[in-house]
């Protein structure tokens, strides 16, 4: 977009697209330039994990956990850890079930079998609620920023910002 509705001075527009890199428009999509100067859209760059240098789309993991009978929703992000990235999977469960060792092993086994060992989350954590945008999309970026000790951008776009408090208090993910 060239501007936001109701953003007469352009501050919201600038914050959304120009704060990550100085004087460079950053929209959050990962693209690949072809040898014929075309571009291939690969998806959201903030929805890409990179453990051990292997690029993984979060949707690959979501596809594996969405139809596990005790999981209602999932959110997956990468956390910078030991000069690499570790995958953290957050889930909500039916009837508030706990994620015990047996359930954790089932989730990891399914991901390993249908994807690869690099896709397997290092940690699986049950959460009370998944944060979402006002349009209903899962908010991966804010959770990733929290667990990596970064400042949250665009908190005003989150429909349920109180859900972020749980992630802020997770002691097992403190770096």
Model regions and ranges:
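Flexible lysine-rich "adenylation lid" loop at the C-terminal edge of ANL adenylation domains
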Residues: 127-152
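AMP-binding/adenylate-forming catalytic core of the ANL superfamily
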Residues: 3, 12-15, 19-119, 138, ...
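Hydrophobic/anchoring residues in structured secondary elements
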Residues: 76, 125-126
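Short Gly/aromatic-enriched secondary-structure transition segments
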Residues: 7-9
């Amino acid at each position: 977009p060239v501007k936001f509705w109701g953003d007469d001075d352009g501050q919201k527009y600038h914050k959304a697209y120009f704060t990550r890199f100085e004087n460079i428009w950053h929209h959050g999509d990962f693209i690949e330039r072809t040898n014929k100067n075309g571009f291939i859209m690969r998806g959201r760059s903030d929805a890409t994990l990179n453990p051990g240098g292997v690029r993984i789309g979060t949707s690959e993991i979501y596809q594996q956990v969405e139809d596990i009978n005790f999981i209602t929703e999932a959110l997956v992000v990468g956390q910078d850890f030991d000069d690499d990235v570790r995958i953290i999977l957050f889930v909500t469960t039916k009837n508030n079930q706990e994620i015990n060792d047996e359930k954790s092993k089932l989730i990891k086994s399914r991901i390993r079998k249908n994807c690869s060992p690099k896709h397997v989350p290092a940690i699986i954590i049950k959460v009370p609620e998944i944060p979402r945008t006002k349009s209903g999309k899962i908010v991966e970026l804010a959770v990733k920023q929290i667990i990596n000790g970064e400042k949250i951008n665009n908190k005003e776009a989150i429909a349920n910002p109180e859900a972020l408090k749980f992630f802020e208090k997770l002691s097992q993910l403190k770096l």
